Amino acid sequence: MAFLRVPLKRLAVLAALSGLVLPGTARADELGLRGTITPEIRVFPQDPSGAKQTNSDLSVSAEVTAKYFFGAGGNQSIVVTPFGRLDQRDHNRTHWDLREARYGLVAGAWEMRIGFDKVFWGVTEAVHLVDVINQADLIEDPIKQEVRLGQPMVRLRTTQSFGTFDFFLLPYFRERTYPSINGRPATDIPVASDLATYESSRKARHVDAAMRYSNAFGDIDLGLSYFQGTGRDPILQPALDASGSLVLAPFYAQIKQGSFDVQATKGAWLFKAEGYWRDELNQQYETATGGIEYTFYGIAGNEGDLGVVAEYALDSRGMVARAPYQNDGFLALRWTANDAASTSLLAGIVVDASTGARGFRFKGERRLDEDYHLSVEAYAFGDVPKSDPVYSVADDDYLQIRLARYF
C-alpha cells in the first residue's frame, strides 16, 4: 500500500490550488460520477519458478471517477479518479493509486491542468516506445505495460491554427511497481523497490520537463516531443537485500529524449510509426517501431470488420535487458463485430528475429448488458533462449479473466 509516496507538502499545494476555485455549492447537473468493481482471476498453466508462487490468483479492483464542472460555461473542472486492488497472494499488488486528481481551466485557446493526470503518446499496437510521461503500473499490466500511474504535473496546452503545443512540468517522480516474491508474472530474481537508487541527487524530487507539438495534415497525424528528466524504465542491477538474498535493485538514470509518432490513413490502410533518440549515461541510441494495418470491412456480408496488423521494432543497442523489442516482428488479426455489445477480438504473435523467441497474445471483450463488461486475455511464450531479455518471465504464461460491473 506504499506506492503513492508523494510528499504531503506537494499534495497540500495541489489541493489548495484546487480548493481556491471550488464554489460553495454544486448543482447536480455539474457533477458526474462513474465507477467499476472488477473481480479478476489469473491462471498460470506452468509450474512456478519461485517456491512461494502458485498457479492461480484472485483479486478485485475498484475505480471511481468524479468530474465536477463549474465556472463560466463550465470552463473549470475538478477530476478525481482513485484506484485500488485487493490481491489474494501478492501484497505488492494490493495497492491503491490516484490515477487523476486535477484542476482544469480553459481560457480561449489555452488550457491548464494542475494535479495528478494521465497522458498517452503513441500510435502502434505492439509496443508504445514514446509514451514517457506516466510511469508504468507493472503489477496491473505486466506484458503490454499500458496501465499507468497518475503523474503529478502542471500542464499547459494551447491550440493554434498551425498545431497544438503541450508543456509539462513534472515535480515528482513515480517509481515503477513490481510484484512481490509471491506474485506472477515476475522475474526469476525478485525486484527490491526499496533499494532503488537515482542518478540525480534529488532522487524522486527531481523536476522533469517535457513539451510536445501535434497537428493533423490532411490524412496524416504527427506528434513531435521532447522529454528531459528521470527515465521511467529503470536499469535493474544485482544487489543484496537486508537478509543477504540476491535481488534486483532499480536504478533510475537521467535522460534526454526526442521522439516522434506519425499515423496516416489512406482508405482501408493505416500506416503508423513511432520512435525516439535518447541520451542516457553518456550513451546515445535510437529505437523505433512501425507498420501497417489493413481493414476488410463487412466480412462475409456481416457487419464485422477484420484488420490485419503487421509491425516491426528495432533498437540500436541490440539485445539488452531493457529492450525486449530490439529486432522483433509483430503480426495480428483484429476483429470488431460492430454490434451493440462492442465485441472485439485480437490475436497476435511477436517473433524475435535475433533469438527465434515467440510471444503470443490474445484479447477478447464485450459488454454483457448495460452494466457488465467481460474481458479475456492470454499471454504465452515459446522457444525463448536464456540470452533473450524475456527469458526470466517465459515460464509465466497466463490466462486472465475480468468481469467489470459499472455503476
What annotation goes with each model-predicted range?
Residues D29-L31, A66-F70, G104-A107, F116, ...:
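Residue-level signature of outer-membrane beta-barrel architecture
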Residues L31, A72-I78, A109-M112, F162-F165, ...:
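Repeated loop/turn-to-beta-strand initiation elements of outer-membrane beta-barrel proteins
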Residues G35-I37, I78-P82, I114, L156, ...:
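Membrane-embedded beta-strand positions of outer-membrane beta-barrel proteins
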Residues I37-D47, S77-Q88, R99, L270-D279, ...:
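Transmembrane beta-strand segments that form the barrel wall of outer-membrane beta-barrel proteins
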Residues T54-A62, T94-R99, G108, R148-P152, ...:
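Residues that define the transmembrane beta-barrel architecture of outer-membrane proteins
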Residues G73-P185, G218, D383:
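Outer membrane beta-barrel
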Residues L156, I292, V393-F407:
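Outer-membrane beta-barrel "beta-signal"
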Residues A268-D352:
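Detector for outer-membrane/organellar transmembrane beta-barrel domains
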